[in-house]
């Protein structure tokens, strides 16, 4: 699948998304777009999954009719997220068009 990372998504996650094509919003030169415009641009560019740390995206955006799957992780700090990266990988692998998944990362 084609996966787009939002601004604060820890980039090292990409190394664990084997078999997926991963790009960042900055790489696509979309780092100035607001979430609604970013999701639309991602859909038009053929991205299938949007990985973000923005827990409020579901309440800020109308997700109805979206074809891109959204996966939300609650942590931006890679050292804290690293032991739980398998949860993120599983969520991305299970994503289906238009789905919304919040990954529950245990905070120690």
Spans of model-derived segments:
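Amphipathic, hydrophobic secondary-structure cores in small proteins
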Residues: 29-30, 39-45, 49-76
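C-terminal structural segments of small proteins and small subunits
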Residues: 68-108
């Amino acid at each position: 699948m084609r996966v787009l990372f939002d601004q604060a998504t820890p980039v090292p996650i990409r190394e664990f998304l084997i078999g997926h094509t991963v790009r960042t919003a900055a790489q696509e030169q979309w780092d100035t777009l607001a979430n609604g415009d970013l999701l639309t641009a991602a859909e038009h560019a053929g991205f299938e999954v949007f990985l973000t740390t923005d827990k409020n995206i579901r309440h800020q955006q109308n997700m109805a009719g979206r074809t891109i799957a959204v996966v939300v992780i609650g942590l931006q700090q890679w050292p804290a997220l690293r032991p739980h990266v398998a949860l993120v990988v599983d969520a991305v692998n299970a994503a289906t068009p238009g789905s919304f998944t919040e990954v529950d990362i245990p905070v120690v």
